[in-house]
Amino acid sequence: TTEKLIQLKGKKDIVKIMIMGLGSVGQYLLDYLCSMNDERIEIIVAGRNRDKMIQDVNIVKVAASIRGTLRTHISIVDGCDLSDIDSIRKCLSINRPDIVVNTSRVYVGLKYGSISWNNFRAYGIWTPLSIEYIKNIMAAISSENSNAIVINTSYSDVTIPWLKSTGYPPM
């Protein structure tokens, strides 16, 4: 991953960042990237629900316009189903991102730990659900021979150790 970052740092043209899943974390990331006011960043928002993504992207665009920082190109790719490796592969093949950020949740609107007991996180429930999406993303990236850097924010304290234990390359 360090080598990939060094190569990316030396890149002189557009850096493509794909955000998979535009929930609250994805929206914060999108807003942050827009606030960087960098025209060399292209953001690709990928997910299932086009109408929701358009609405969320427009909110961020309006905020960036008000701040005077809307120099980033943002495109929306719908039909990217993270439970379907071929769907992810197609999305990656068409867009060729340099960085892929998985901010997805299997169930929309459920916050981390919302189905938990007092002092015990319900990892038994979330682990297999969370692992499926990032596992599929990593499989699609491998099959595309992509050199993209992958960042996973979806239950990362559970999913990243699992990925490492199965031999997936470091993110």
What is the predicted role of each segment?
Residues S93, N118-E144:
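NAD(P)-cofactor binding segment of oxidoreductase domains
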Residues S35, I43-R71:
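Glycine-rich phosphate-binding loop and adjoining beta1-alpha1-beta2 segment
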Residues L22-G23:
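Glycine-rich Rossmann-fold phosphate-binding loop(s) that bind the pyrophosphate
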Residues M138, S142, S146-M171:
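Rossmann-like dinucleotide-binding core of oxidoreductases
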Residues T1-V15:
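A short, basic/flexible loop-to-alpha-helix module at the beginning of a structural domain
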Residues G79-N95:
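Conserved Rossmann-fold cofactor-binding substructure of NAD(P)-dependent oxidoreductases
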Residues T103-V108:
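Conserved NAD(P)H cofactor-binding loop of Rossmann-fold oxidoreductase domains
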Residues G26-L29:
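N-terminal Rossmann-fold NAD(P) dinucleotide-binding loop
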